[in-house]
Amino acid sequence: MFDNFVVPNLLPAAPEIFLATMALAILMIDLLVKDSRRTVTFVLTQLTLIGCAAIQFATSTGEITYTFSNMFVDDLMSDLLKLFLYMTVVIVMFYSRGYVIDRESMNKGEYYVLALFATLGMMVMISANHFLTIYIGLELLSLSLYAMVAMNRDSVVSTEAAMKYFVLGALASGLLLYGMSMIYGATGTLEITGIAERLYGGGVNKSVLVFGLVFLVAGLAFKLGVVPFHMWIPDVYQGAPTSVTLFIGSAPKLAAFAIVIRLLVNGLITLAADWQAMLVILSVLSMAIGNLAAIAQTNLKRMLAYSAISHMGFMLLGIVTGVVGGDARYALNAYSSSMFYVISYVLMSAGTFGMILMMSRAGFEAEELDDYKGLNKRSPWFAGIMLMLMFSMAGVPFFIGFFAKFSVLQAVVAAGPGYMWLAIVAVLFSLIGAFYYLRVVKLMYFDAPADETPLSAPMDMRILISANGLAVALLGIFPQVIMSLCAYALLRSL
């Protein structure tokens, strides 16, 4: 029975194995340790993530390595995205600490364990080379997030948001699975590299493939939160506890980018003309509806939700312009610009939601725009940090957000005259988007505060928020640090 069994190479998946083991151990330890502040659970969670980063460094070979019967791949792209993922989740956990302690219904060990399992799901997605691996990682992430959104059981809004997220998430998973089944029916394989080989070989029913591709792109669009599959984003961002909104609004974007590259670029590049046409529509609609709807919002979390939709639409421009008329010479430049954009957005989003968490306290959620009136009078330093984050999101020179937009736009322009209209549309909607970011700056600096008490926050929170804001500014001066990392990782992975 076991004559043909081959022991897989476990080394490429060592960080995933370590994280899964530690998540289960932390769950058991949390039951045994009596600690109302969950300090032990928090510290173990952070050490686990740092341990994952150390293992990732130690086991990285820089080569493309397949294991588990080619279902799992380890390459430089996955290494880089996972390292940014660990860093993001560590920051998210630090930002969330005070908020979670102040809310009894959330101050449980399960919060940290669910965050670890969600991280594990993202790690699996980033390294997936098989439809089933993608689906397993996606469901592990989604189920963890559904539970995290519903953790504040005292809030009807949170419960409602969790239900909407669950129902629409199940629908998206169904679309993705149906698309995968159609592509499997046409190619006879579930392996992403195997699908690419079959398509290059020819003799595949293209009508079935394109039909499957439509469902696949719809499922991916939901996970990215782009129009018209964005319905869940505003309600979930606003309804979820702010610490969970921070988690949803940052780390999963890295995993979503990875599966777009794995599925569309690694697997279905021969169908580029078909999926590019779909992504152009999704991108333009997302930039239009995201930016225009954000203007009307009075709730900062909801405004940032529509902002996220527009940012993901902008990111898709880089994916769209990778292959032009069958010519892939611009692919590395285009895809690395999108990767840089996603990493920049995650950094900016983490800092912005971190500011909301710092201003929130027990019984008070600092999520209305009016809560930021006169912040400069209450805390000039943190008003300055928020200003840098808003300027960066708006794409004001010389912050990281500006260079993220600039790198994508130059990739679009380099693709040729046929794409020039896309660059013009992107610039126009970026200018419209600048309005609602600058409105926050106006409220902080030119309106009178309703509450003039100085802003108080723990020292570790103050240091981390300050570092986050300064990173947005410094990486705007030296963007080539991350740009070159993205380009090199994709050069060695595609």
UniProtKB/Swiss-Prot annotation:
NDH-1 is composed of 14 different subunits. Subunits NuoA, H, J, K, L, M, N constitute the membrane sector of the complex. Keywords: Cell inner membrane, Cell membrane, Membrane, NAD, Quinone, Translocase, Transmembrane, Transmembrane helix, Transport, Ubiquinone. GO terms for cellular component: plasma membrane. It is found in: Cell inner membrane. It is a multi-pass membrane protein. The keyword Transmembrane applies. This is NADH-quinone oxidoreductase subunit N. It catalyses: a quinone + NADH + 5 H(+)(in) = a quinol + NAD(+) + 4 H(+)(out). It comes from Dechloromonas aromatica (strain RCB). Its main location: membrane. GO terms for molecular function: NADH dehydrogenase (ubiquinone) activity; NADH:ubiquinone reductase (non-electrogenic) activity; quinone binding. GO terms for biological process: ATP synthesis coupled electron transport. NDH-1 shuttles electrons from NADH, via FMN and iron-sulfur (Fe-S) centers, to quinones in the respiratory chain. The immediate electron acceptor for the enzyme in this species is believed to be ubiquinone. Couples the redox reaction to proton translocation (for every two electrons transferred, four hydrogen ions are translocated across the cytoplasmic membrane), and thus conserves the redox energy in a proton gradient. The keyword NAD applies. InterPro entries: NADH-Q_OxRdtase_suN/2, ND/Mrp_TM. HAMAP family: NDH1_NuoN_1. The chain crosses the membrane at residues 13-33, 39-59, 76-96, 109-129, 131-151, 166-186, 209-229, 243-265, 275-295, 304-324, 339-359, 382-402, 412-432, 463-483. Its EC number is 7.1.1.-. Belongs to the complex I subunit 2 family.
